[in-house]
Structures are given as structure tokens and as C-alpha cells.
């Protein structure tokens, strides 16, 4: 369970309201320039990973609040930041750390309102280590004033950083996308799943008429000359990589939505005005999508803030309450924008429910991907459901287990682990599990996974952490049986189970084959001349049939299994691709 916000001390409140400098565009005038910590040219390997091994200096830390102040020089692509973190720990300690990209120049570091001399902190590799002459009692405030040119992604959002783009009219268009590398690409944070602040407050200063859209609720704006400061505040825990900056000459669509639970909350879309008719059409898709998720999973988790969508120069990302959208208003054969639906799914699977270790990232992406066929079924029926599932089935790699049960960074998941299988294979595992459990038990399990309870209502839940074992325990409870065998084969093994079907003179024999001969008593539907029989498959199973009978195993595609036809198709695609290159 994610920890609830802890009340701030009077000292912390004073620092937040009084200690921020009037300008964060230059080093404080009392700081000798010789003491300014210079940046490195490139981000370090430490910065470019998120999650994984936890630094000894961070193991006992949590973040109660993050106060983030940003301003920009758009011509020079410089970000100026002033961050105050309220940190907590179970016991006093003299040394602790947060993470920040070494590309930034450190101008000031303050601990509990006192500026630290240069020899009391270092940021050699992207871990900003702070040392005190005495034990620090917690909660404590750490303020970092910094500036520099942040990492610019080559291919966002797959490559992370701050994008400095231009609109068609030549206006600045800035967006952040840092899921793969982490929050430390543009603000000091604890770059781990557990590093989520219980509360985040943002002050974003931009030249008029630019608009700054971010997480949470817009408290107010303040004009000073040619600049405008947007003051935003979250009301719940937010993923660190989900804290996002979006700046452009946005227009705004807003409406109030009443959910199936009876509560009302705002829907907002920040968009560029060039394609207003298409923006309106996209915005009109939101109410039906929300109703789908609330019917199938449970209440929208952040109704006390907003449902937010923002147009970005990259494809998209699940930034909490300000989902990034850059799919160019494309439609697919499902009749909806799949990208917006997928990213919005992460409000439930990723933001309300967060994996406690990136090794369990399939809980975000597998469920997020399964929501597209499920939504197609909700809108159009079973045929549309299987069209989506079949499209997803074609690309499975099955090279690594989906879950390794080790501590992993997100990079490890993609470079050393299951990579794209956390999406489509994860979705197919979920589809198969639904068939085994039946809809009632399955959807109760999913709801409990997301909310920690089966009866969520607005106001009776908070964001939670979970992992694969948590889900297995929930599934076993609601199925009233032990389905460990299912997860042993589908999640903890790489290879798919294979069905052998052997025809002989007077019958047909079915058997499951798995790596390491793992038990796999998966029930199997068999169609004989159009009549369906279900086999329990506790062991080898034989049926009497003649050589003229038509026998189809799993005619309704309920079971994810090895099928040679998909391997042949992948081989043909690869061969055809190589031929075109020549």
C-alpha cells in the first residue's frame, strides 16, 4: 500500500512558502560562482536506468512532498529548476541521496533551510549525495537549485528526456517523457517505484501566451510582466515518471462528467488549435471510455483532480491525470483511438496500481494492452474482440519469462528480459486466465488487484503497490482453487505450452507439453463436426473419432499455446522484410 501523506512540520511549510528565490534563472548572488557544481556533457548510466538496485543512501527514504518550480530559456533550451523535497525516514541518518542528471549545474543545495557548503554534497554519477555533520532527523527538507540543458530524446517516448519542439506556427512546444530513464532527467527525485511523492506541487513559469499543463488541479495563475506562472497541485500519490511538463500555445476543452458512481469530475483536453474538429472528435470519445473502465474495473481513481489529456510531439505516455497524446487523431477498425484508450488504461494499471518492482511491469502493460480487445468487445461484440487479440498474438517472442522474480530496472526488462512480451503476451495470458476463471471471478480479481478491495467506491481507496504474487494470491482466492500451475507456465517460463494432437485409426489423442514437464492441467475445448466437448486434460486424453471426422482443438481460441502457424508467419515476415531491403 502506498503510504498516505504525512503532515508537514511548521518548518517545512515555512520553507515552502518563504524560502524559494525570487528568480531561479541565475545562481543565488551570495553563492560564489567557483562553488557552482559544473555539469557533465552526457547522462551517466546511473541516470539512464530507473528502478533496479537501490542505493544504500536511499533504502530508508520516502518522499512526503515534492515542490517543483520550473522556468525556461526556450531559445537556448535551458531548464531552470528549484525543487524542495520533504523526505522521511524511519530513523535519523547523516548521509542520504536523491537522483539528478549530471547534465545540470547545481547552484545551491539546502538542508532544512540552511545552504550547504560545496563539500557537503556531490553529484558525480547522477546520485546527489548529501552529508551532514550530525544526524538528520526526519522529516527533513532538501532544496536543490539547478539549471542546464536536459537530455533531449532522439525518439521519444521510447527514448527519454525533454523535447524542445515547435508548433506549425513556430511557437515553443515542450514535453517531457521519461518512463524509461526516470524522473531524474529533469528534477531531483528518488528514481524508484517507491520514490513516489505523496503530494506534488508545481509552479511553472512560461512566457505568454504559452500554457503549462501538468498533473493534478490548477490552483491559480499569476502574471508578472510578459510571464505567467501556473500553480498546479496533486491530491494523491503520483508516479515519479508520471510527473510531466507540457508547454505550448494550447487551447482547452473542458466538460463535467457524471460517472456511473454518481460523482462528477472534469474532463480536460489541452490541444493545438490547427485541427480543432479532430480534437473535438477525440474529446467526445472520452465519456464512453471512462464508462467502460468504470463498469469493467472500477471508479476512475483520480476524480478529485481531473481526467486530463494533452497533445504532445511524441506518441504518448500514461502521465497521471495529464495523459500524453500524439497519435495524430488516427482511428482504427475498432472505431476509437487505440492510443488514447491504451494510455488512459494506465490510470488504473500503472497509476492507481503500481508495480513495486519493474520485474512486474506486465501488470501495467499486459492489462493496459488487454483493455483494447476488451473495449472492442464492449463496443462491438466477440468478433471485434478476437480481431484485436489475433493481431496481438502474431508478434510474441517467448524468449524470456514475463516475470523473473528478481529486482529489475526498466532497462533490464527490455534489454535482458521479456521486452515487448509484457504487452501482447501479457494480454493473452490475461485472456486465457479469464477463460479459466469465468467472468465473475476474473473481474473480481482484477478489481481487487487494482484497488486492494472488491467494493471500490469514490473515496474508499488510495493508490497501491502490488506485484505478481499479490495477483496470484488474489486469483487463487477468487477462483477457490490453486492456479499456481497456470502462472508457473505462462509467467515464470518463457516457452508456451504446446498441444500435441495425434490422429490414429479409431480416435484422436491430446496431450500438453511444457518446458521441464511442468504440470499444466489446462481444460481444452474440442470441436468434432461442430459439436464442442470440454476435456479436463489432467493427463493424456483420447476421444473416439473416425478418420472422416473434422476435429478442431480450442475452436474458440481460449488458450494461449504454441502454434506453428504463427512461427511460419513470423518467419515469412522476416524473410519478406530482408528481401525488400535488398
State what each model feature region is.
Residues 34, 96, 101-165, 542-547:
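A surface-exposed beta-strand-loop module
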Residues 18-80, 165-172, 194, 484:
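N-terminal, polar/Ser/Thr-rich
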Residues 106-111, 483-484, 504-556:
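Beta-strand-rich binding/interaction modules
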Residues 235, 365-432, 436-437, 453-456, ...:
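Acidic/His/Gly-enriched intrinsically disordered linker/tail segments
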Residues 178, 287, 324-387, 446:
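Zinc-dependent metallopeptidase catalytic helix centered on the HExxH motif
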Residues 419-508:
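Amphipathic alpha-helical substructures
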Residues 81, 178-179, 190-341, 370:
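Hydrophobic helix-coil surface modules that form long, contiguous segments used
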Residues 55-58, 136, 146-200, 255-256, ...:
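Glycine/proline-rich low-complexity spacer/linker segments in large multi-domain proteins
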Amino acid at each position: 500500500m502506498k503510504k498516505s501523506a504525512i503532515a508537514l512540520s511548521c518548518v517545512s511549510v515555512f520553507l515552502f512558502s518563504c524560502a524559494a528565490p525570487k528568480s531561479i534563472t541565475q545562481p543565488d548572488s551570495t553563492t560564489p560562482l567557483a562553488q557552482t557544481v559544473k555539469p557533465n556533457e552526457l547522462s551517466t548510466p546511473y541516470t539512464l536506468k530507473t528502478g533496479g538496485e537501490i542505493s544504500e543512501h536511499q533504502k530508508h527514504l520516502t518522499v512526503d512532498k515534492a515542490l517543483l518550480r520550473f522556468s525556461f530559456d526556450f531559445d537556448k533550451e535551458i531548464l531552470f529548476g528549484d525543487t524542495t523535497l520533504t523526505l522521511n525516514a524511519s530513523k535519523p541518518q547523516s548521509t542520504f541521496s536523491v537522483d539528478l542528471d549530471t547534465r545540470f549545474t547545481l547552484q545551491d543545495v539546502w538542508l532544512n533551510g540552511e545552504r550547504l557548503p560545496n563539500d557537503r554534497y556531490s553529484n558525480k554519477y547522477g546520485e546527489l549525495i548529501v552529508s551532514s555533520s550530525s544526524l538528520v532527523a526526519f522529516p527533513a527538507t532538501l532544496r536543490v537549485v539547478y539549471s542546464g540543458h536536459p537530455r533531449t530524446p532522439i525518439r521519444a517516448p521510447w527514448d527519454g528526456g525533454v523535447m524542445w519542439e515547435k508548433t506549425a506556427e513556430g511557437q515553443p512546444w515542450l514535453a517531457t517523457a521519461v518512463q524509461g530513464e526516470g524522473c531524474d532527467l529533469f528534477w531531483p527525485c528518488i528514481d524508484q517505484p517507491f520514490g513516489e511523492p505523496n503530494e506534488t506541487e508545481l509552479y511553472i513559469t512560461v512566457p505568454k501566451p504559452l500554457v503549462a499543463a501538468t498533473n493534478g488541479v490548477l490552483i491559480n495563475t499569476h502574471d508578472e510582466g510578459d510571464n505567467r506562472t501556473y500553480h498546479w497541485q496533486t491530491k494523491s500519490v503520483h508516479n515519479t515518471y508520471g510527473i510531466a511538463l507540457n508547454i505550448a500555445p494550447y487551447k482547452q476543452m473542458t466538460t463535467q462528467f457524471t460517472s456511473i458512481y454518481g460523482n462528477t469530475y472534469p474532463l480536460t483536453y489541452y490541444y493545438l488549435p490547427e485541427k480543432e474538429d479532430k480534437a473535438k472528435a477525440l474529446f467526445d470519445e472520452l465519456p464512453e471510455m471512462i464508462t467502460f473502465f468504470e463498469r469493467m474495473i472500477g471508479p476512475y481513481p483520480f476524480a478529485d483532480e481531473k481526467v486530463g489529456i494533452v497533445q504532445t510531439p511524441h506518441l504518448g505516455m500514461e502521465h497521471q491525470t495529464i495523459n500524453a497524446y500524439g497519435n495524430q487523431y488516427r482511428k482504427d477498425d475498432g472505431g476509437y483511438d487505440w492510443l488514447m484508450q491504451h494510455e488512459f488504461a494506465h490510470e488504473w494499471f500503472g497509476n492507481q496500481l503500481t508495480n513495486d518492482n519493474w520485474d512486474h511491469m506486465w501488470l501495467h502493460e499486459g492489462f493496459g494492452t488487454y483493455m483494447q480487445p476488451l473495449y472492442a468487445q464492449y463496443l462491438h461484440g466477440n468478433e471485434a474482440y478476437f480481431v484485436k487479440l489475433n493481431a496481438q498474438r502474431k508478434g510474441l517472442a517467448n524468449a524470456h519469462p514475463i516475470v523473473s522474480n528478481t529486482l529489475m530496472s526498466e532497462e533490464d526488462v527490455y534489454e535482458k528480459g521479456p521486452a515487448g512480451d509484457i504487452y501482447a503476451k501479457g494480454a493473452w495470458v490475461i485472456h486465457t486466465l479469464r477463460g479459466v476463471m469465468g467472468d465473475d471471478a476474473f473481474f473480481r480479481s482484477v478489481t481487487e488487484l487494482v484497488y486492494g478491495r472488491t467494493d471500490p467506491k469514490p473515496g474508499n481507496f488510495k493508490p497501491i503497490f502490488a506485484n505478481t504474487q499479490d495477483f496470484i494470491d488474489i486469483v487463487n482466492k477468487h477462483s477457490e482453487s490453486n492456479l499456481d500451475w497456470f502462472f508457473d507456465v505462462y509467467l515464470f517460463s518463457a516457452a508456451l505450452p504446446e498441444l500435441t494432437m495425434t490422429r490414429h485409426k479409431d480416435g484422436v489423442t491430446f496431450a500438453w507439453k511444457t518446458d521441464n514437464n511442468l504440470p499444466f492441467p489446462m481444460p481444452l475445448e474440442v470441436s468434432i463436426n461442430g459439436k464442442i466437448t470440454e476435456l479436463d486434460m489432467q493427463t493424456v486424453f483420447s476421444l473416439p473419432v473416425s478418420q472422416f471426422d473434422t476435429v478442431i482443438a480450442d475452436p474458440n481460441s481460449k488458450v494461449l499455446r504454441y502454434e506453428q502457424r504463427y512461427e511460419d508467419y513470423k518467419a515469412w515476415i522476416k524473410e519478406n522484410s530482408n528481401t525488400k531491403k535488398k
